[in-house]
Amino acid sequence: MKRLVVIGLACLLSACQSGFADLLPGQPEKTTDYPTMGADLSDCVYRAAQGMRSPYLFRRKASTNNLEFLVTATGSNAVKPSTLPKLELRFITQGEATTVEMRDTAIGDHELSHDVWSIVDRCAQQVAKPSAAKPIAP
């Protein structure tokens, strides 16, 4: 019985520490660094993507340490999920910057990839911290 508890605890702890890198195989299609926090950027992208007119269902997940976020696009319930590609955006917070990686399946929807990456760029500009803002004299 103790053995099962130890094995179960080890499995639970290893799952909590695992990142999102193993969800879609292969190298990212695109990777870019942005001077913003991952939580803010991923939330902005998720909300904007939900507002798109598309047959995709968008979801947002956070890692247990809140340093990695994942926004996925999959086929909605109305459409067979196997007929639509899957797209993943991985947001990796590194200090005050975030690396964004985009992966999609082999049958990728290039229009979706372009639209979603445009949202990432737009959101990065919206949530970026102003660099060396100077006070305005009265």
Locate predicted features.
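Post-signal-peptide N-terminal segment of Sec-exported extracytoplasmic proteins
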Residues: T31-A73, L84-K86
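Sequence contexts marking disulfide-bonded cysteines in secreted/extracellular proteins
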Residues: Q17, D43-V45, R122-A124
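Processing junctions and N-termini across compartments
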Residues: A10, G38, T98-V100, W117
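Bacterial Sec signal peptide processing site at the extreme N-terminus
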Residues: A10-T31
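C-terminal partner/receptor-binding element of secreted or periplasmic proteins
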Residues: E101-P138
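Sec-dependent signal peptide recognition
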Residues: K2-G8
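Extracellular/mature segments of secreted proteins
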Residues: L24-P25, M52-S54, K129-I136
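Mid-chain, structured segments of secreted extracytoplasmic proteins
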Residues: L67-D104
